């Protein structure tokens, strides 16, 4: 059992007889009395997203899952294909389950497959990935003084803000949890 206050986006729980992936968590605390945890849960059996509210201190059951090291191979527009690094077995995961992770997947990226009853139900990304900048504005003299950043599009289609010294063709390290620029690779 896990306390609802410890729920985080991406976790898997068993709730009302179904397994759900936590899509969003909002914690509201009142001046007096207990807090309220509002969640959005995606059912793995139906694919539907539902709202669930919990009182602070409530507990939910963690889903019994296993994890396998795998490598991303390719996608065909509907499914993303991964190869188990121990058995070399290939698994297809629907794009709806890959969700936002698709912006961090390039060929040969190593991930953890999330398995339930020997079937893949999702993926856990590495903390950082290296991606190439394919589109950004050119630098102008004096840009570095203003601070901040400029928009950039990466090879996977991800749009982020990067420092002014980053140019098209540069490889950068991106945090997969926040989607933010970390450093040049």
Swiss-Prot record:
GO biological process: peptide biosynthetic process
GO cellular component: cytoplasm
A Pfam cross-reference name: EFP
InterPro entries: Elong-fact-P_C (IPR015365), NA-bd_OB-fold (IPR012340), Rib_uL2_dom2 (IPR014722), Transl_elong_fac_P/YeiP (IPR020599), Transl_elong_KOW-like (IPR013185), Transl_elong_P/YeiP_cen (IPR001059), Transl_elong_P/YeiP_CS (IPR013852), Transl_elongation_fac_P (IPR011768)
Main location: cytoplasm
CDD domains: S1_EF-P_repeat_1 (cd04470), S1_EF-P_repeat_2 (cd05794)
Location of this chain's protein in the cell: Cytoplasm
Statement: the UniProt record of this protein carries the keyword Cell wall biogenesis/degradation: no
Pathway membership, UniProt: Protein biosynthesis; polypeptide chain elongation
Keywords: Cytoplasm, Elongation factor, Protein biosynthesis
MF annotations from Gene Ontology: translation elongation factor activity
NCBIfam families, alphabetized: efp, PRK00529.1
Function: Involved in peptide bond synthesis. Stimulates efficient translation and peptide-bond synthesis on native or reconstituted 70S ribosomes in vitro. Probably functions indirectly by altering the affinity of the ribosome for aminoacyl-tRNA, thus increasing their reactivity as acceptors for peptidyl transferase.
Family: Belongs to the elongation factor P family.
Descriptive protein name: Elongation factor P
Organism: Fervidobacterium nodosum (strain ATCC 35602 / DSM 5306 / Rt17-B1)
Lineage, opening ranks: Bacteria, Thermotogati, Thermotogota, Thermotogae, Thermotogales
């Amino acid at each position: 059992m896990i306390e609802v206050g410890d729920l985080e986006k991406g976790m898997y729980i068993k709730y009302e007889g179904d397994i759900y992936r936590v899509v969003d968590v909002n914690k509201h605390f009142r001046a007096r009395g207990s807090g309220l945890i509002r969640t959005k849960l995606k059912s793995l059996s139906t694919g539907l997203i539902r709202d669930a509210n919990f009182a602070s201190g409530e507990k939910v059951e963690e889903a019994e899952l296993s994890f396998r090291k795998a490598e991303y191979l390719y996608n065909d527009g509907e499914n993303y294909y991964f190869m188990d690094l121990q058995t070399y077995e290939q698994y297809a995961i629907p794009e709806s389950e890959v969700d936002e992770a698709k912006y961090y997947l390039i060929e040969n990226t190593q991930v953890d497959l999330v398995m339930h009853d020997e079937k893949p139900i999702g993926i856990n990304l590495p903390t950082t990935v290296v991606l190439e900048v394919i589109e950004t504005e050119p630098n102008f003299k004096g840009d570095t003084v203003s601070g901040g950043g400029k928009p950039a599009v990466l090879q996977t289609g991800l749009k982020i803000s990067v420092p002014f010294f980053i140019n098209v063709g540069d490889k950068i390290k991106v945090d997969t949890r926040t989607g933010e620029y970390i450093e040049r690779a």
